[in-house]
Amino acid sequence: MNSFMQMPAFRKGSHNPHRALGPFSLCVPLVTRLRNAALVLRNATMVIAASLALAMVPNIASAQDKAAGKPAKPDIAAGQQIASGVCAGCHAADGNSPSPANPKLAAQHAAYLAKQLHNFKPQAEGKPPERNNAIMQGFASALNDQQIRDVSAYFAAQKLKPAAAKNKDLVELGQKIYRGGIAEKGVPACAGCHSPNGAGIPDQYPRLQGQYAEYTESQLVAFRQGTRANSSQMMTIAARMSDKEMKAVSDYIAGLR
């Protein structure tokens, strides 16, 4: 008999989990497999669609810059085409993501955005990307250097619609960590690199202000776990922080302006 249809025998009076769940209990594994397959198909479809959209975006780097071996200046109009055709589904066309699962990109420093896109790409000699995200790896791999400059410049030029702090119970702890660090753990003040208002420093440290607390917290956890490994400095800092400290400072950052 097919193993999928076999059911364990139960003595009279014993608890039968299949009976408790009803006649659809045997369908649960199949439903789970179908749901997972649908997610894989959706992600693959998004990457294919992104590649097709990118193929229609003209690469208009100046011939003079190419001949001189210089990177062409960013083209914000071309970047907008990429953002609308490729990035909008998760981050919104203007970079103000509607979901806390996806970061807000609006007003982020162009150099930081470009670095992250490059970090999502596989490295030389078959080494894995420095940032591990299957969806972003597919998108980033479809972008050439000029397109990365273009879309990064476009998002940097957009106006941020900031998120907000939500947890009043943790605001004092979050403020203390952001402005003064955690001396006993060797955690420096966030403001030292990201500026007192969270605006960051162009070409050095990213803008944090107004970012979703959920996203910021998830990245601190990723640095601590080593699943995000493109900043040794942040990996060291995150390794010294507790879950509560991460949550507190992330929520405080969301309220910075």
Which role does the model predict for each range below?
Residues 1-40:
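N-terminal secretory signal peptides that target proteins for export/translocation
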Residues 44-56:
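Bacterial N-terminal signal peptides
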Residues 62-83, 96-101, 157-183:
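Electrostatic cytochrome c docking/interface patches
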Residues 80-88, 114, 179-191, 203-218:
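Sequence context surrounding c-type heme c attachment/ligation sites in exported
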Residues 87-93, 151, 187-197, 249:
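The canonical Cys-X-X-Cys-His
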Residues 98-106, 120-166, 201-207, 225-257:
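Axial heme c-ligation environment in periplasmic c-type cytochrome domains
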